[in-house]
Design a protein with these regions (language model features):
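Extended recognition/assembly regions associated with phosphoester-bond processing machinery
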Residues: 1-290
Length: 290
């Protein structure tokens, strides 16, 4: 059997961006841009200038810095879900046409906000399946759907969708909110069992789901952890994952997406990192002071 090239995951500190190095190839990965988000606020009487240019300049800076071969975006390019707002008709094509002048390989994995995204993307931008893609030992998908079965052969699953933040109160009573990275251990047999079940693969009570995956799909199950990326658009609201006022169960139910709801991801023991790389503890130690 040929040796797989090593896959290295490097957060591009202090940005909400991840560099995936697989063999000699470099993939820059970001998630949740939500272009047109501020236009939605205008409907509520709050007027915020368009963030598109700021986000574009920031992304171009990161591309110049790390010189990736390819840019992968884990979904939620635009903000409105089904229909397309006027601002998105304008901003989404401009955003990607400018990016294509910097980098010729761009892959988009659609998120739940990306209905009809194809019509907004210029030629040259590849739209991948919602069930995700494999880059070396990393499986990438947005997080609102089940991943493709082949992603179970990756050591690390990487999703967006949740926009994780932590919130603390300082001694003066001020609230501080920071975007964070989440890296949670996975219970592999449970994840394999629930994914196979989703794809209607029949399992008897004492079947070993990992054996079935090997036998029926020729996939060696390898998933060990799941990474939740911070949103690239830092202007958005986030999900304070350390809220103590409601029970953990409620928070977990609130974690939208079938993989997080399946009970196979141990969020209690998830490691939480700030964007500058500081490890601030595991989630069960980070209750918010209220
Ligand atoms: Mn989403």
């Amino acid at each position: 059997m040929s040796e797989e090239p090593r896959t290295l995951l490097k957060p591009v500190s202090p940005y909400p961006a991840l560099l995936i190095e697989s063999g000699s190839e470099k993939f820059l990965t970001i998630s949740d841009i939500h272009l047109g988000w501020e236009a939605n606020l205008a409907g509520e009487g709050v007027h915020v200038p368009s963030q598109t240019n700021k986000l574009l300049r920031r992304l171009e800076r990161i591309i110049s810095l790390v010189k990736p071969d390819c840019l992968t975006i884990l979904g939620d390019i635009k903000h409105t879900i089904e229909k397309i707002e006027l601002e998105e008709w304008r901003d989404v094509p401009i955003f990607f046409e400018s990016l294509l002048r910097k980098i010729s390989c761009i892959k988009v994995i659609p998120g739940n906000h990306d209905g009809n995204i194809e019509v907004l993307l210029p030629e040259g931008v590849e739209v991948a399946p919602q069930q995700g893609i494999v880059i070396g030992g990393a499986g990438l998908f947005h997080g609102h759907t089940w991943p493709d079965i082949k992603l179970l052969g990756c050591e690390t699953l990487i999703i967006g969708h949740i926009h994780p933040t932590v919130t603390f109160k300082d001694p003066m009573g001020f609230r501080i909110t920071s975007q964070v990275w989440v890296r949670a251990p996975c219970d592999r047999p449970t994840l394999v069992r629930s994914t196979l079940k989703h794809y209607n693969v029949r399992l008897k009570r004492d079947d070993d789901p990992e054996e079935i995956l090997r036998a029926k799909f020729s996939i060696e199950p390898k998933v060990r952890s799941l990474i939740v990326m911070p949103s690239f658009n830092d202007f958005l609201g986030g999900r304070a994952i350390n809220r103590a006022s409601i029970s953990r169960d409620v928070i977990f139910k609130d974690f939208i997406g079938p993989v997080l709801r399946s009970g196979s991801v141990d969020l209690e023991r998830a490691e939480i990192y700030l964007l500058d790389g500081t490890f601030i503890g595991t989630l069960n130690k980070l209750s918010m002071l209220e």
